Structure formats: C-alpha cells, structure tokens
Amino acid sequence: QMPGSGGSARVVRLIGMTRAKDMVMLGKRVPALEAKEIGLLTDVAPDSEALTEMIIDYASKLNALAPLSMRSLKRVLNAALDSPLSVALDVEGHSYEKLRWTEDYMEGINAFSERRKPNYKGK
C-alpha cells in the first residue's frame, strides 16, 4: 500500500493531510469527478473523443506561449512549492531578470502594443 516515486509526498501537497491519509491508507479509488473536485485533476473528459480534443486544445494553448517563459515559470512554481519563501522569491526575481533580456520578451511587448499575437522564437 506504500505509494512509490514520491506519491505520498505529492498527494499531501495536492489535497491535504486528512484526505491524503484517507485515500492512501485505505487504498481508496477516487472517481474522476471527485478527483477534480479535490484538486487531483484539472479537468475530466466524458469520453475518449472529448479527451483527445481537450489534449489537442491544451497543447495548442501551451504551444502559443513563450517557451523560455514557460520553462522558467515551471522552475519558479516548483521552487515556490519546495523552498522557503525567501528562496522562491529569489528564484522568481532571477528568472524574471534573465527573461527581460530575451528576444521573446520584446516580442511579447511589441505584440501587445501592436495588438497582434506574438510570434515567439525561444530566444
């Protein structure tokens, strides 16, 4: 019944100690809608066709974003969860300062002021 690969640590962070103990210690299976309600899932698809559409839509949205910013944001969010606040703030500040000098940063600003979609290059 012991979760592997850090599952016990992750589930506590996602749904809290009480729910995690109930679910993990009793080996409870959580239905999809309940998993969404308690924060284990962000969305639920009614069938495989809808799931495929949701995945394509999600991937399209991610693909339209600035890749350097997304990579940095992932690191910042992970630091926010795993580090003291002072460390997380340092990681965020350093990441922001580094991104300010990229071509993608300027493309985002220019696209906003020109009221057009940005064309990010990952540079």
Describe every region a protein language model picked out:
Residues 1-24, 38, 54, 58:
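CoA-thioester-processing core
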Residues 11, 35, 73, 112:
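Terminal peptide-recognition signature
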Residues 23-24, 76-80, 95-100:
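Helix-loop "lid/cap" segments that line or gate small-molecule binding pockets
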Residues 27-34:
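Acidic, divalent-metal-coordinating active-site segment for phosphoryl/phosphodiester hydrolysis
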Residues 38-39, 115:
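Structural motif
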Residues 41-90, 119-123:
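C-terminal long alpha-helix characteristic of the crotonase
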Residues 101-105, 111:
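Interdomain hinge/lid region at the active-site interface
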